[in-house]
Amino acid sequence: MESNVRVRFAPSPTGPLHIGGVRTALYNYLFAKKHNGTFILRIEDTDQTRYVANAEQYIIDALEWCNIPFDEGPGKNEKFGPYRQSERKELYKEYADTLIKTGWAYYCFDSSEDLDAHRKGHEAEGKNFIYNWHNREKGRLINSLVLTTEEVQTKINAGDTYVIRFKTPQDEILRMEDEIRGKITIDTNTLDDKILFKGDGMPTYHLANIVDDHLMEISHVIRGEEWLPSMPLHVLLYKAFNWTTPKFAHLPLILKPVGKGKLSKRDGDKLGFPVFPLEYTNEETKDVSRGYKEDGYFSDGFINMLSFLGWNPGTEQEIFTLEGLIAAFDLSRVSKSGAKFSPDKASWFNQQYMQTKDNTELVNLYTPILREKGISKDKSFILKVVSLIKERAVFVNDFWELSNFFFEAPISFDAKASKKNWKEGTTELMTELISVITNINDFSSENTEKEIKEWITNKEIGFGKVMQPLRLSLVGKLAGPHLFDIIAMIGKQETIRRIENAIDKL
């Protein structure tokens, strides 16, 4: 049974992939791998009016960066292809025709003006116009339920524009099961007759989705909560075709950090965080939207963070490798209620992953930043720097702020720290310290610390009177790694030069 698990991620190429979409892909991927199943990418491009040319490649690039590759999809193991719905449109017409022949669908020739008039007429009476059993065979509606077969054929032959609607059954209580939300019951009398095939010759999402899921042998439909209202129609379509219905699981929304509602790009722009996995450039406006990759997030930390937006393992553990997530993931642990996004938590995850990264990997990421600043140092030196600062970093982009003093002397000194720590007598102490440092032969961190502290002890003064001005001289502020590690790294001559510079300026 487990090897028959087949799930799909089916985004529409209408723009960049939102992190909510990435989470849907991730949950599908985790579920598939947990059950030794297949993860499929299908591009649902039936809405040609909203199609964006570079969106499909963006989706594929995003999944690749997130390390959640698809097993089947465009250009890969196309056993059930093609995997773009626009390349399957002839197929859908056959299935729409089948529904008409079996009485589950009908032709509608109403123009948009006709429908607007019906809506306004109903609104004038304080009613909502719903195209369903209540009025589809009454009044002035023009469809194959009120026209004769000859009249319908005449209209089709004349090239009249038509849509095909699903004929929702009347007076039926539909009982459904969702893997996350449990039992769902709905009265079919409350449903409208959705369009299955549009006037432009393309199917709607509903028909194409069901046909493709059946033909691609999808066993579980794991998708966002926004599709929950479509579940009754989709279940009825399976019934109409006499096909086995897959199991459904509707994921909770990702909510904005502040206030109520679904997380949007506007929230990210307002609060200063990305909502897309990769940077995205709008080809029309040339507007650039930030991406988690370009903002310095590690893909594995990003995925770990996303996994907890709606799911938890039932333990206190928060840090998981991808393999760990696969082993722990279970739909029964997915929440029904929305998950509030936290930019701070996203940063926290990145910081946790920073500590687990191999220093060599971090050096490779930091070296281009140094190169842009015109700094060239051997790899072993940068490796030592990274090992000293990474515990204080959230992003690799933080490295320069945390380590610039290893590469260049400070050009200014923190005013508040200078006022507090460079007092009367400090210049004399620092001048004497230069002599002490000059006479140190073993300039290792341990030995330098030992000799300078012995000198301070012998002078019977507080350590702070020397250590704080010394750190200020070398770093420019009262921050940074262990002071004597800095001294050992920059060397004797540079240490002396910086103290002399501080004496001169302070």
Where does each model-flagged region fall?
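Glycine- and acidic
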Residues: 7-13, 40-45, 216-221, 284-289, ...
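N-terminal Rossmann-like or analogous alpha/beta NTP/dinucleotide-binding catalytic cores
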Residues: 1-128, 229-240, 301
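Active-site-adjacent bridging/hinge elements
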Residues: 2-5, 34, 207-210, 274-280
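Catalytic adenosine-cofactor/nucleotide-binding cores of aminoacyl-tRNA synthetases and other
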Residues: 242-413, 475-506
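Generic alpha-helical structural context detector
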Residues: 61-64, 97, 304-307, 327, ...
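Residue-level signal for inorganic ion chemistry
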Residues: 28, 59, 99, 103, ...
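Active-site cores that bind ATP or allylic diphosphates and position pyrophosphate for catalysis
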Residues: 107, 111-267, 274, 288, ...
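C-terminal accessory/binding modules appended to enzymatic or scaffolding proteins
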Residues: 418-479
